[in-house]
Design a protein with these regions (language model features):
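Structured non-transmembrane domains adjacent to transmembrane bundles in polytopic membrane proteins
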Residues: 49-70, 79-164, 386-576, 608
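Conserved ABC transporter NBD signature motif
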Residues: 778-789, 797
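Glycine-rich P-loop/Walker A and Walker A-like loops and their local beta1-loop-alpha1 context
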Residues: 742, 753-776
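Conserved beta-strand
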Residues: 734-751, 781
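A short helix-turn-beta junction within AAA+ P-loop NTPase domains corresponding to the substrate/partner-engaging
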Residues: 867-884
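ABC nucleotide-binding domain signature
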Residues: 184, 598, 757, 795-813, ...
């Protein structure tokens, strides 16, 4: 892959204006399209097949008024006055609401069939509205006529009266950004300028990240017309896209600047930077992408959609870094080259810097380091035992939001339970006295602990479904309300035995419990998926057993610490002022699984960027301790800069973030800080020091079955080092190439125009042909075939080298005639050529290739090749022999 990325980087550098124009055109096209055709966000939280959701769906069919989209107007009279004094104005407003086309029904506070719409003090009243927007979430423009009626009512009431709109229709808090989030980008710019040593260079990662986020957001806004997208999704994607977009560009750009400092040509440097660091970026992005798509394990639609769009944002960030960034490098050209160091500075002996000092401390005292870090992180994890989760509600919005104002007024004048009423539905089709039955159920429910009131208990018009509205004593995110839901569910068997009716409990809190239970159930399989993926990926990358185990344990410590810190601040209220939190509150239900997914990808990024350099030092002959220290000093500054940037981006989404995103941003900021600085840059060197040589041990059987990932562009580095090898004009040059158990070490050289025979047992002969054409993995030596280096560029060899085994074709003549030959052609089992047509087809093929390529004819023995004029015959060595040339 690194060779392909190298070519992509150079192409984008050369075609810079075209690439830049394409990306900016795509951004403009999607932006305009989104502005013209975007839909609205939907904050409906649903779980198909859950009992509460099925009850709600059934209610929509049998009692549509009870399940319709709702809104309410809260009217609060001035201190010392009663709303009854302004009944005429309120009733007129009810009529005005009723006249609006989207209002199915407007219920007056003095409706004789509904209780609880006037507060006990008489100072506040509620106007209930049932709305119909065709099943779609309403936009602010669609709600404007309703809001206008409320404003007119407030103007008609005595001075000091408050009229606020709230309820389900107004609970959608639209995503917004403020100047505070921009501070994170300013900090990122400062860090980039320090690391890269240039303000111009520092601006490139910001430009690419913002472009990528803009494209992803425009696409998301456009698709709101097709998909139900939660309002948390865009801010999550913006936050994540900016963080990874800047980091990915930093890794590539820092490599480019280092290479320019060493005197490399800018175009060549761009290609190498994309081929080497770009390989790590692809791996890093892929891990985050897979983890985000893994959120679908929970089988909760809104969470799956959130994961998909966040994953798309990360994918766009990766592609932008691999294409748009090298194009911008090409635009700046030599201006990206750092100023050369003075001769005096170059000769001055370097003093150990802070990174050398820090890794020295951790590796000199590994046991103390491990005990201290683990103890601190376990202690920080303990508050997670009290972690409270809930779905978003208006009470978690900013104080200036209309829905939040209405929420607070309802809590103050009617009690907190009015903001989260429960609905009990009853199947009363077999009842002969539906009104009496509903009255009995109402009396039973009013006697349950935690019930404040039952304002409504009525059958529908067909008398087959009953609806009971239950107002708890506590708010929707209070654990006591969840206890009440369970108490109502426990009474279902009693009501079936007593009244012969089946009942269900639904409403926001009931759905919340179902979602929380389903998310809790999904945590284990998702955790197994993440941990399993971590072990396999890192074992494949580092060819080690202990490195992935250590990395996974570190990831779990980071996740636990992030959970604990989030519970401490948001649930317990410790230092809540720091995050601009008014009061302790639950965090959004899907935060745990979301944090696990995102932090997994980010943790693997830092592990790969840091430990791969240590492994490189070890492979090149340094002792384990020297490799740890050298790798840390070399990669630590970039990893630290990347972590600081990511923390800054996340942290500045906290102060002004909407309720759900505030907790998510805080948890991610803490998680990244813990993982980067305590786990990867402190715990990892200490653990690797204790492991010593064992850190890089991998059983041979596991080494054979694991895939190989070239995350640091080692293949490209090898190809660059051997770009002139063998340098003799050959089209095929093999040096001790071998396949364990199949082909012994072989040496072979072909120049353009050569036609040779290769003989030997089927295994050795065919194995050699497959290995030389990139179709069989080699275990020793190397070769260059048609310009492709083996074993590194086996894919390129397969594209450039043709292989045909006549033992597997029905008509050799037709197969040979239809063949599109590559630079080198291997024809196996030529002894099967018997017809004149097949001989003619082979001669024609040889003539087509002979000009600038070579042909190898393979057979069991040399006698089968006598019909062809050959430049020589080569005996393919089997693995059991050392013979290399006939």
């Amino acid at each position: 892959m690194s060779a392909w990325l190298y070519a992509v980087g150079r192409w984008c550098y050369r075609r810079r204006l075209t690439v830049i124009a394409l990306w900016l055109s795509l951004l403009a096209l999607l932006g305009v399209s989104a502005g013209l055709w975007m839909g609205s966000f939907n904050n409906a939280f649903e779980i198909p097949s859950s009992r509460s959701q099925e009850a709600l769906d059934k209610l929509r069919m049998t009692f549509p008024q009870g399940a319709a989209l709702s809104a309410l107007a809260v009217v609060v009279a001035p201190e010392g006055q009663q709303v009854a004094e302004s009944r005429e104005q309120i009733e007129a407003a009810v009529a005005d609401f009723d006249d609006l086309p989207m209002v199915e029904a407007a219920t007056s506070p003095w409706n004789e069939y509904v209780d609880g719409l006037i507060s006990d003090s008489g100072r506040a009243a509620i106007i209930q509205l049932s709305l119909d927007f065709g099943g779609e979430a309403p936009t602010e423009e669609q709600l404007a006529p309703i809001t206008d009626v409320a404003d007119d009512l407030e103007a008609a009431m005595p001075a000091g009266t408050q009229v606020s709109m709230g309820g389900e229709a107004y609970n959608i808090e639209l995503p917004h950004l403020s100047i505070i989030e921009g501070i994170g980008l300013i900090i990122a710019l400062v860090v980039l300028a320090v690391v890269l040593g240039s303000l111009i260079a520092a601006g490139l990662p910001l430009l690419t990240a913002v472009t990528g986020v803009g494209i992803a957001m425009a696409l998301m806004l456009l698709l709101t017309r097709i998909f139900d997208i939660n309002s948390t999704t865009p801010l999550l994607s913006v936050m994540l896209g900016l963080a990874v977009g800047i980091d990915y560009a930093l890794f590539i750009l820092s490599r480019h600047r280092d290479q320019l400092r060493d005197g490399l040509d800018p175009e060549e440097s761009a290609g190498r930077a994309v081929g080497t660091s770009g390989s790590a970026v692809v791996f890093a992005g892929l891990t985050v992408f897979i983890a985000l798509l893994g959120l679908g394990v929970a089988n909760i639609p809104f969470l799956t959609v959130m994961g998909i769009f966040a994953a798309v944002t990360v994918a766009v960030a990766v592609v932008i870094a691999l294409t748009f960034l090298p194009a911008l490098m090409g635009l700046l050209g030599e201006r990206m080259r750092p100023k050369p160091r003075s001769a005096a500075a170059a000769k001055r002996p370097g003093r150990p810097g802070p990174f050398a000092w820090w890794v020295g401390v951790t590796t000199r005292h590994p046991v103390a380091t491990i005990v201290t870090v683990v103890a601190a992180l376990v202690a920080l994890t303990l508050p997670v035992l009290g972690l409270q989760v809930s779905l978003p509600n208006a009470g978690q919005q900013r104080p200036d939001q209309p829905a939040r104002i209405a929420y607070d007024l309802l809590s103050e004048h009617f009690g907190p339970g009015v903001n989260g009423p429960l609905i009990v539905t009853a199947d009363i089709i077999g009842s002969t006295d539906p009104l009496g039955l509903m009255a009995s159920l109402k009396d039973d429910i009013e006697g349950i602990d935690g019930v404040a009131q039952v304002p409504l208990a009525t059958p529908n018009q067909n008398a087959d479904t009953g609806l009971i509205q239950v107002v708890p004593e506590t708010g929707p995110d209070d654990p006591a309300t969840a206890d009440l839901v369970r108490a109502l569910m426990e009474r279902q068997d009693h009501w079936l035995a007593e009244y012969g009716v089946e009942t269900d409990v639904t409403g926001l809190t009931a759905v919340q419990i179902d979602i929380s239970e389903k998310l809790t159930a999904a945590l284990l399989p998702f955790g197994v998926l993440v941990v399993g993926l971590s072990l396999v990926l890192l074992a494949a990358v580092f060819r080690s057993v202990w490195v992935p185990i250590k990395a996974t344990v570190g990831y779990l410590l980071s996740v636990g610490a992030a959970f604990g810190a989030t519970a401490l601040v948001f649930n317990y209220g410790v230092a809540k002022e720091v995050v601009n939190l008014e009061r302790p509150m639950p965090v959004i239900s899907f935060l745990p699984i979301l944090l696990m997914g995102i932090l997994f990808g980010l943790a693997m990024d830092y592990e790969v960027f840091l430990v791969s350099r240590m492994r490189e030092e070890y492979v090149h002959g340094k002792s384990p301790l020297e490799a740890i220290r050298g790798g840390f000093v070399a990669s630590g500054p970039v990893v630290m800069a990347a972590a600081i940037i990511m923390i800054a981006v996340f942290a500045f989404f906290v102060p002004e973030g909407m309720g759900a995103i505030k907790a998510i941003a805080f948890a991610l900021a803490v998680g990244v800080a813990v993982d980067a600085f305590l786990v990867r840059m402190t715990l990892v060197p200490a653990v690797l020091t204790l492991l010593g040589e064992k850190a890089w041990w991998l059983p041979a059987w596991l080494d054979r079955i694991l895939p190989t990932f070239d995350v640091e562009g080692e293949v490209l580095s090898t190809e660059m080092a051997l770009k002139d090898w063998p340098g003799d004009g050959s089209v095929l040059f093999a040096d001790q190439l071998a396949v364990a158990g199949v082909v012994g070490p072989l040496d072979l050289r072909l120049v353009p125009g050569n036609v040779i025979g290769m003989v030997g047992p089927t295994g050795a002969r065919t194995g050699a042909a497959l290995a030389l054409s990139g179709r069989l993995e080699t275990t020793g030596g190397r070769a260059r075939v048609a310009g492709a280096l083996l074993p590194e560029a086996a894919g390129a060899a397969r594209r450039r080298v043709s292989y045909l085994d006549l033992a597997h074709v029905d008509d050799p003549a037709q197969a040979l005639s239809a063949m599109r030959p590559g630079k080198v052609v291997f024809i196996d089992s030529v002894d099967l050529i018997t017809s004149p047509e097949a001989h003619a087809a082979l001669d024609s093929l040889i003539d087509r290739v002979r000009g600038d390529g070579a042909v190898v004819l393979c057979a069991a023995v040399e006698d089968h090749l006598t019909d062809h004029q050959l430049d020589g015959v080569f005996a393919a060595p089997s693995a059991a022999h050392e013979e290399t040339r006939a």
